[in-house]
């Protein structure tokens, strides 16, 4: 298909300059197509699989903590491609190739060839794949397959789970990577060594690999576009994961990782599912670890695994059973990092001097040393060690070599009473890792979520098997069910809790939020970004419920209360207020005392201050200048406490110079005062100068 795409692009360029008719339209369409292809190229270099579930997740999850500097080369190429994508806009100025006639036929040929190019491009392939994965499907048939552990553990052994970043078992191949991983190869001969372990859709990146292995479900985004995860109160609240179960069995769950736990919602996942302690890069920074022991992603693995060893000893001495989970980082794509403990270590490879190979060699040594320490300690006999790759390697400096190999994840189980064996799976994935661990702890247990133990000869149907048969045509049912774990299935009642969060099902969401329901009043989509625009542009056959401050919907609302505007499929509307929302409103109830007519264009808040400021009590005059502002009056307000408490609000009209003056009275000091305006989503305001001037009372001289 690549040759067809190349031919279509060349023909599109020729058709662009062949006729001056509609030249700018043709140039714009071609530039847009090239821009999309450039963006796809960058995403593919990062994900290794084009635009997939991982792409969608990270677009909607917190990117803080990502080692962006590691990808500077990719980004530089992307910027170059962006500039090249704009070249059609320059080509339209070349007139010597243009024919004065035949413009209509040329334009028709251009449109036809553009459609051919799109069909031949990876954009069409990935879009089609995502459509089949994310489209609404009936998941009822797989609901019985989702099983949670219930029976008690009779032997509560300690567990150490070591995730090796991108450390797939493919690196064990002595023909390709001779002597690269001698320590873990030796450990594998004494362990349950699982072979042919795949990564299904929804398990192929770090947080997804952790969710899949610890919960037995693929990770999908919530039914919508949640942003940064901090607007969602809980991470997969309906899932019951390994940490939840072990905590109920009296375990203490402890995580230590080198990267920022906020990245991709990892910390939120762990704290939502039974982990008592989550240590990340900030913990090591607070401990005073020297800067040389950090990379762009976080603390290096030598420091991390030393801390894991210290934590293991501390937890073991306490006498309470525990799960200690750690995640290495230095083998992260594209080139890896080398910690101080391995600076003098080199891996001589026929492939050349490749930094990632040195990092893998180092990781093998450091993990091997930690495993040996644990096994040789007086606590080793009561400990099960799990060594696993979090996912297959992303595009890296060895991608061309790995592409020629049979790829498989790493999964080893090591313990005093665990008989060494190699288990070759026919249709296994990381979804089954947690279930296998549970069977090693308690032989009668074989399932965790959709995961099935590799050691069970008569395991029931699994999501892994569904993903591997018939091109995975039944696997979207498992993805659809996993999506419901964000909110639960009882989502037809909405209410506002005491913290000002919207409670939908079992999830708590910080407004503003737009909920879209289908014609059967099943929750279809949750919009958390650009909600006012989405509300205006969404033409649903079901019901829409938009929750925000009442100021978003009406003029005379200066109390800061919450309101919900509900629009049913007949376009009947009703505005519910704070008392109704505190009690709860039923989305499927008939709307009484409704109004008809076109939907109102709701307002959205726009922050005018750069950052929150601490402000003492007193009377102030807010003065601001805005060169770009609406031509009509609008609301401006002062807010505090994460924008929950409205301190002052006024309907303002800028003067001819764009100046706005507004009194603000504070009865007490405010730690986080912010100023914001309420505008239609088509409007904007740009503040050039803003000052909060305290009124100084004039002394009485009488």
Swiss-Prot record:
Q: Spell out the SUPFAM superfamilies in the cross-references.
A: Alkaline phosphatase-like (SSF53649)
Cross-referenced InterPro entries:
Alkaline_phosphatase_core_sf (IPR017850), OpgB (IPR020881), OpgB/LTA_synthase_biosynth (IPR050448), Sulfatase_N (IPR000917)
One Pfam assignment: Sulfatase
- Which top class of enzyme applies to this chain? transferase
One GO location term (cellular component): plasma membrane
Where found? Cell inner membrane
What's the catalysed reaction? a phosphatidylglycerol + a membrane-derived-oligosaccharide D-glucose = a 1,2-diacyl-sn-glycerol + a membrane-derived-oligosaccharide 6-(glycerophospho)-D-glucose
Question: What name does UniProt use for this protein?
Answer: Phosphoglycerol transferase I
Species name:
Xanthomonas axonopodis pv. citri (strain 306)
> What gene is this protein a product of?
opgB
